[in-house]
Amino acid sequence: MVAGMRSYLAAAGVDVAEESATGRLVLSSDRDHLIDGCRFDLEGMMRSLEEALKEALHAGFAGLWATGDMTWEVGPDKDFSTLLEYEWRLEEFIRENPQMGGVCQYHIETMPRKFLRQGVVSHPSIFMNQTLSMINPVYRYSDSFASAQSGAPELDSFINRILERQSMAEPQNLT
């Protein structure tokens, strides 16, 4: 994933070596957010993001932007049980810290549909590709974990419509 991002940025005209050397660009595949290198550590990930934002602001940057492949983020155990809570806590953190932004990547070929639904309802906007993004009409604020499980047919229909629109692009990022 990191090599692919490096290549994409270079093709877009970013001097990846220079930006990395100055600290303006950090590409990492570290898995410090995993317990025993296998299970997702929700608390550890939130602390890590809070610390990274503080460091960026302290270094004089206007903010921090992050992205992650959610299947990769949960680790090799593929335990998605805390994914929805993480997404809602992350959204709350971003609301409280407008200097923070990012994109959570949900790739349909690696994410079970149940958790894809959770990803869709937990984000107020959907980024499909460089030219297509939208306000998420099925977004549900974190008032109820149960609400993310209700309406599965509605969510599946919405996800299918998104995938139809995106069928020519590679890979699909739903949130």
Where are these regions (language model features)?
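Non-catalytic regulatory/interaction regions at protein termini and inter-domain linkers
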Residues: M1-T175
